[in-house]
Amino acid sequence: MTVLRRGVRLGIDVGKARVGVARTDPDGLLAVPIETVARDAQSVTRIVAIAEEYSAMEILVGLPISLSGADTASTADARTFAGELATASGLPVRLVDERLSTVSAHAALRQSGRSQKKSRSIVDQVAAVVLLQQALDVERHSGNPAGWVVPPGQEPA
C-alpha cells in the first residue's frame, strides 16, 4: 500500500441547482460531508471559503461522464466550474471520474432508511464523499493522484 500525500482534500459534486461539498481528514483516511451549497453566483466564493477554512491542499471536482466514457450533458458544466474554482482558489483543482457516484449516494441513503424527499438536501454531499473516497482509493493503490489537473484561468478540454 502506498502512503498518501498528507493534507485535506475537498470533494465537489457539481449539480445544476446544488453543489455537494465533502472533505478528507489530513491523513486521507476518511471522507466526510460538509455542506450543500446553492448553485448560484456565490457558489465558487463559498467553496473557496470552505477550502480556506479547512486549509485544503487541493480540490477534486467530479466529472460526470457516461459509463462508456463519453461526455454527458453535465460534463462541460463541471469542467467550467472546475476552471472557475482553480482561478478563484489558487489551489490545484483536479477533475475526477465520478461515474455512478450519485447512484451510489442514492443507494446508500435508501439503505439508511431515508426517503428520496428527505435525501434531496444531502445527496449531493454524499455523492461528494463517494467521489472523494474513490479518488483516495486510486491514489492509495496507484501512488498517483486521481484525475487531471485543471489549469487556472482556462477551461480544461
What are these regions (language model features)?
Residues 1-12, 16-157:
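Phosphate- and other anionic-substrate recognition elements at nucleic-acid/protein interfaces
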